[in-house]
């Protein structure tokens, strides 16, 4: 990417806040996220954040386990993202980092109702905008919510931080030792191959608005690296597909 990046949106999984020992929101991991968001902000990058809720509850999994209907399960998942967002917002404020916590669901005691206009104003003021509760509608994931926010806020790039893979592969590298990683993959090739690291609906939205997506490992790399180091992860965009050479 040759374009200067001035505004980004990070999609962070809820798992990035939790530990294997069972802490749903771990102090060390939360502190790391806050420190990294500060580092990005110090680079004069306007920053929005969409965080998942998988560390607390996975709607689809809960639907099957508890035999509740899909709409209720997805709404429970949305509330889990709000809990994470509240934790991040309070941690940012405790570190004197200005932020705006938003929700697509109306809960005025907890968060501002999301609007593109209010979020745009906050970004222009140097605040980190935290977007929770996905799209506010069931059957759509936080990936799709992140893509929608990226389009509305006209970010330069959407950066998806994962905990399990370090980019886009032709098949799951955790299951197949011969999986091939892409340095770059075009929107059209990603969709044609039905790759699973990001929802097709999210990729389609970004393709329509020509917003590139970088998928990277939050275990191996920092948020700042994901913005400035073009050699990490995989870039999904308009450029031709290129397989990683080891």
Curated annotation (Swiss-Prot):
Compartments where located: Cytoplasm
Among Gene3D superfamilies, the record links this protein to:
Acetylglutamate kinase-like
Provide the catalytic activity annotation.
Answer: UMP + ATP = UDP + ADP
Q: Where does UMP bind?
A: 53, 74, 135-142
GO cellular component annotations of the record: cytoplasm
Q: Name one Pfam family in it.
A: AA_kinase
SUPFAM superfamilies assigned to the protein according to its UniProt record, in alphabetical order: Carbamate kinase-like
Coiled-coil intervals = none
Keywords assigned: ATP-binding, Cytoplasm, Kinase, Nucleotide-binding, Pyrimidine biosynthesis, Transferase
Instruction: Enumerate the InterPro entries for this protein.
Output: AceGlu_kinase-like_sf (IPR036393), Asp/Glu/Uridylate_kinase (IPR001048), Uridylate_kinase (IPR011817), Uridylate_kinase_bac (IPR015963)
The regulatory note on its activity is: Inhibited by UTP.
**Biological role stated in the UniProt entry:** Catalyzes the reversible phosphorylation of UMP to UDP.
- How does the annotation summarize its subunit structure? Homohexamer.
The protein depicted here goes by the name: Uridylate kinase
Lineage per the UniProt record: Bacteria, Pseudomonadati, Chlamydiota, Chlamydiia, Chlamydiales
- Which gene is annotated as encoding this protein in its UniProt record? pyrH
């Amino acid at each position: 990417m040759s374009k200067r990046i001035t505004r980004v949106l990070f999609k962070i999984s809820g798992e990035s806040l939790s530990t294997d020992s069972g802490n749903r929101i771990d102090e060390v991991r939360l502190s790391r996220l806050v420190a990294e968001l500060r580092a990005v902000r110090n680079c004069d990058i306007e920053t929005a954040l969409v965080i998942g809720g998988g560390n607390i509850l996975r709607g689809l999994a809960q639907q099957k386990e508890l035999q509740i209907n899909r709409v209720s399960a997805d709404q429970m998942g949305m509330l889990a993202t709000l809990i994470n967002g509240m934790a991040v917002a309070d941690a940012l404020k405790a570190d004197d980092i200005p932020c705006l916590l938003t929700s697509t669901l109306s809960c005025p005691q907890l968060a501002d109702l999301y609007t593109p206009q209010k979020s745009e104003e906050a970004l222009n003021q140097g605040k980190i905008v935290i977007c929770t509760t996905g799209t506010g509608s069931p059957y759509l994931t936080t990936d799709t919510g992140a893509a929608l926010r990226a389009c509305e806020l006209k970010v330069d790039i959407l950066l998806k931080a994962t905990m399990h893979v370090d980019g886009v592969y032709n098949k799951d590298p955790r299951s197949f030792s011969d999986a091939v990683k892409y340095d770059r993959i075009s929107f059209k090739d990603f969709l044609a191959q039905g790759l699973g690291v990001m929802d097709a609906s999210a990729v389609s939205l970004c393709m329509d608005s020509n917003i590139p997506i970088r998928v990277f490992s939050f275990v191996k790399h920092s948020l700042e690296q994901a913005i400035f180091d073009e050699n990490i992860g995989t870039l999904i965009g308009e450029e031709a597909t290129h397989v990683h050479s080891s």
